[in-house]
Amino acid sequence: WDLGIGDATSVIFSQGNRAGDLRIVDYYEASGEGLPHYAKVLQDKNYTYGRHMAPHDIQVRELGTGRSRLEVAASLGIRFETVPRVHTSVSGEVEEGIHAARMLLSRCWFDETRCKALLESLQHYRREYNTRLNEFRATPVHDWSSHGADALRYLATWYKPTKPRPV
């Protein structure tokens, strides 16, 4: 999951297998919706869920209610585990997550129909080029494509294949 309030929330539905591959079977993204909406989406999809993984910001308490999104989700029947942070600086964390996602992609199988929006976001995810300095910026562009890519980055940071792939 990549949780957004003003931004999109992105959900990747995946299954690991004994060979260490990851099947990305579905993808859902919406904007401006609260957690009750996503609880209904999960119910309507009628999948059997093992784990729901979310970034560390799920533990932030909302000013209005004093409850975290983690607590709200639990009250709706969604049990999240928090993806551990991989680095102390934001740019370092993003970079390490991008590297983890690149390493994971060779193990992924995508449902092309159900994951079309995710695949498009991954194809358009990029860094902005600074023409004055002749270099790419340290962090990726934050636009429509970053939500699905961030969800994959969190998944890649968390996912540990059960069996190494032969070289």
Model regions and ranges:
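Mg2+-dependent endonuclease catalytic cores in nucleic-acid-processing enzymes, primarily RNase H-like
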Residues: I12-D143, K160-V167
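Gly/Thr-rich phosphate-binding beta-strand-loop-beta motif of the actin/hexokinase/Hsp70
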Residues: W1-G16
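Histidine-centered active-site/metal-ligand motif
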Residues: H147
